[in-house]
Amino acid sequence: MAATGYPVLILKEGTQRTYGREALRANILAARVLAEMLKSSLGPRGLDKMLVDAFGDITVTNDGATIVKEMEIQHPAAKLLVEVAKAQDAEVGDGTTSVVVLAGALLEKAEKLLDENLHPTIIIEGYTKAMEEALRLVDEAAVPVEVEDDSVLRRIAETTLASKFVGTGPERDKIISMVIDAIRTVAEKRPDGGYEVDLDYVKIEKKKGGSLLDSKLVRGIVLDKEVVHPAMPKRVENAKILVLDAPLEVQKPELTTKIRVTDIEKLESFLEEETRMLRDMVEKIAATGANVVITQKGIDEVAQHFLAKKGILAVRRVKRSDIEKVAKATGAKIVTSLRDLKPEYLGYAELVEERKVGEDKMVFIEGAKNPKSVTILLRGANDMLLDEAERNIKDALHGLRNILREPKIVGGGGAVEVELALKLKEFARTVGGKQQLAIEAYAEALETIPTVLAESAGMDALEALLKLRSLHSQGYKFAGVNVLEGKIEEDMTKINVYEPVLVKKQVIKSASEAAISILKIDDVIAAAPPKKKEKKGKTGEEEEEEGGGSKFEF
């Protein structure tokens, strides 16, 4: 096609494009900056981050998943890494900080190879081979454990909580005991010896007041609500529970309407009709044999009165997530309309009771039809402490779920990373060619984990790494960093520091895939932000300043 001499506009005005090595290096830098931010939070001696949102709310935590969720990341490559970390948290509930740190290290090593004019495709191929070999080696190094033994679960939970707010003292022991009891309750054994654990059966309810030592495990569901009417029973045994997703109120017309009453008798008949409709609703509920009503919507005051007269305990405006948990626990079917109500839709529990917890009242549903439903009722001095304790408990629950799903462990404290690095360097020599350089770089990146752990313990990181390499070359495959005592151990499993193999494999896989995804990008096309609407009284210069292209800062 002949050129016409006129400019050809492909992209919308204001669109910013970066391509080639410049785009790749910018993406690598963004990911490395994010990894550098999280690095100091890794391990038992990891430091906390204080996160302040746009409303001034403060979160203090060293939990990697919480940090990446709360941070407002702007650069697209860093956002990609954040999404990988979130996926790691959703998949196994642990190892989010490790994923980001390892991905950052892999990209740092890749950048050095790019400086040596190694093509990104070769680096990607080398990293892919290294990842596959690393996953095979982790399985090879893993040691089976007897998960029927509570002491094994306790040590896994201790390792998970070592870097957390509740990592020491009687509070830790209390939480670990509750978590083990909860997991044992909801776990179902598979024919292959592993377990299936549905954590949806474990509810965490927080109530300010008291201390963490006042927390307890309830075998049932706890609702942060109170009985709606003072005349209703506060305790119902052999409860037949109606779970509603519908209001016990007279429905208002969807259209705006006005009713003009010219006669007082007509007003009375109108009110009587409303009362009759509400009475009929309650009669229909009572006819099924229900003696407890739990609804997501509201309950009219007149309906409350009739329910109380029937001796029915009622709770209103319960969260959707709690409604689903109650239905699952009691075997009830969520009813969306009273027209569909049948006795077989009711759930069952041995006891529904309102109890005072601190200064508030809560409703306890115990002895549910499904015995696998439990609630961890957390107590604490303030909301910040309770939020962090909740995050810690979720981490411990996921850690135990992972070891039950695949009952194998590897040494903690960076032991498995050093072992993998040693074996991958040997593997690289068998591959040869330029891919050998990429596999060796991958191996060096793995050593970032023990290096960071050693730094957090106040040790000389280089000296610690050299000693670990020496021990692993002598056959000590679980030699690692004892962060709490600031020394190198020949076998981390002997001091009860180990990790579920499922988590370790997912960390390697997620970090590798994140790094490879970023290395595949050679063109970044960012659309211009939408221009603000022109405001009256603005000068032309001010209007001009509102436009412009995209800009990424990190």
Swiss-Prot record:
Residues 530-554 are annotated as: Disordered. InterPro entries: Chaperone_TCP-1 (IPR017998), Chaperonin_TCP-1_CS (IPR002194), Cpn60/GroEL/TCP-1 (IPR002423), GroEL-like_apical_dom_sf (IPR027409), GROEL-like_equatorial_sf (IPR027413), TCP-1-like_intermed_sf (IPR027410), TCP-1_chaperonin (IPR053374), thermosome_alpha (IPR054827). Keywords: ATP-binding, Chaperone, Nucleotide-binding. The keyword Chaperone applies. The keyword Zinc-finger does not apply. Gene3D superfamilies: GroEL (3.50.7.10), GroEL-like equatorial domain (1.10.560.10), TCP-1-like chaperonin intermediate domain (3.30.260.10). CDD domains: cpn60. One of its GO terms (molecular function) is ATP binding. NCBIfam families: thermosome_alpha, thermosome_arch, thermosome_beta. Belongs to the TCP-1 chaperonin family. Forms a Heterooligomeric complex of two stacked eight-membered rings. Molecular chaperone; binds unfolded polypeptides in vitro, and has a weak ATPase activity. This is Thermosome subunit alpha. It comes from Aeropyrum pernix (strain ATCC 700893 / DSM 11879 / JCM 9820 / NBRC 100138 / K1).
